Amino acid sequence: MASDSSFPGASSNVAEYSVSEISGALKRTVEDTFGHVRVRGEISGYRGPHSSGHAYFALKDDRARLEAVIWRGSMSRLRFRPEEGMEVIATGKLTTYPGSSKYQIVIEQMEPAGAGALMALLEERKQRLAAEGLFDPTLKQLLPFMPRVIGVVTSPTGAVIRDIIHRISDRYPLRVIVWPVRVQGDTCGPEVATAVNGFNTLPDDGPIPRPDVLIVARGGGSLEDLWGFNDEIVVRAVAASHIPVISAVGHETDWTLIDLAADMRAPTPTGAAEMAVPVKADLQASLASQSARLSSAMSRFFDQKRQAHRAAARAMPSADQLLALPRRRFDEAASRLTRALFVNTQKKRVHFDGHARQLSPRLLQRRLVELERGVTMLGQRLPRALEAFLRERRTAFTHRANRLSPEPILRRTRLTGSTLEQLDRRRDQAVRLLIERVKRRSQELDRLMRTLSYESVLERGFAVVFDAQGKPVKQAAAVSPGDALSVRFRDGDVGVVARAGLTIPDPTKGQ
């Protein structure tokens, strides 16, 4: 039999480790050696921040991939929002998980890998959103000339809000509503988008008035500082806003995607306030100037009309001149009227005399004879006409009397009476049937009640057990030894005391 010393390595001086020991040693070596490293790579598989506030992703390059995690505390200190595909430089420490032989970097700080990477990402996003029409100039809204309420989305503690309020107060004091947001960091974009959407959802007649124009403002800063205003959700919220939006982010040389989506871009927050409201003094001066111009124009208008009236009055002839011709025509017509009346009277007199000569007694006598003859003829025709009329009326009366015979009415009356008798008989029969049915149903219910009644159960030899409170006992498990019970039989109650060790007989053994 071969000795154990014959196996290779049996007498070697190499230390022997368990899996846990070698994994722990490897963990200590990695964490000691790479306790503080800077890693450059592209963000891949970004997931976060979760409800816990942590974010998980990987850093990769062309040949390798390193898992990464940012805990909640470090995540809140980032000056930008990590995004898929962004090239960054991460500072942290490497650690391993002995249970799964995996390692990752726990990131404590992270920054974009130079402005070039951010500019490339910004240009790609700009082209994509522009293709969707979010920057279309035809969709821009006009700013109201005289807004009543202005909504401002900015930090409530910075110099920006003070400059805006001060500028508005100097130009035209009105109501300003501030929606406080963070203007830098990972939560900047979501908070700005929420503020714009929140202002748009305010009702016109609510306790908080709906603004007529919005100002999204922030002071100057680096590309990383302003990165939250390049967030896609901010651009979409501003483009979808029904309230005109003025973008005032950074200095005049700075630009962000919100500037392209807004309805107006201001070089500074103070400039945004100047765009939003006019100067009250300028309005008053303009109003006074226009009022003076209106008064001057009205004076000139009335002077011109007054001069035209005077010129027309001078050109108009006098009353005597105007009435001279009509007066002469009236006098001529009056003289002609006198002559015409005389001539007409003479004509009428001659015509009357001619008719008077025609009215001789013999002519009147002849006319009277003709009238008497006509009356006589009508008197002879009248009896025959009257008899024919009466005969026609009598025939019509007889015809109508025949139509009004009582026989059809009597026949209809008899038919109606027969129908009423049938209905009476059917009603009486239905009432009797209903009464019998109700009586039978009542008898059945009475029998059922007697069968299921409490007394019927006792009559059949059963008994009911009550506890000390007089409540029925439904289960043996509800009774404890020594409990005072009452057993009710058909003819009375018996008091008993429960004992221990009783068994429940099997009802099937006696069969």
UniProtKB/Swiss-Prot annotation:
EC main class here is hydrolase
One GO BP on record is: DNA catabolic process
| GO molecular function per UniProt | exodeoxyribonuclease VII activity; nucleic acid binding
Task: Give the catalytic activity.
Answer: Exonucleolytic cleavage in either 5'- to 3'- or 3'- to 5'-direction to yield nucleoside 5'-phosphates
Q: Which GO terms describe its cellular component?
A: cytoplasm; exodeoxyribonuclease VII complex
From the Swiss-Prot or TrEMBL record, state where the protein is found.
Cytoplasm
Q: What is its EC number?
A: 3.1.11.6
Print the keywords alphabetically.
Cytoplasm, Exonuclease, Hydrolase, Nuclease
Lineage, top-rank taxon, reads Bacteria
User: Where does it primarily localize?
Assistant: cytoplasm
- The set of disulfide-linked cysteines is none
This chain's function reads:
Bidirectionally degrades single-stranded DNA into large acid-insoluble oligonucleotides, which are then degraded further into small acid-soluble oligonucleotides.
Family of this protein = Belongs to the XseA family.
Binding partners and assembly:
Heterooligomer composed of large and small subunits.
Q: Which PANTHER family does this entry report, sorted A to Z?
A: EXODEOXYRIBONUCLEASE 7 LARGE SUBUNIT (PTHR30008:SF0)
Protein name per the record:
Exodeoxyribonuclease 7 large subunit
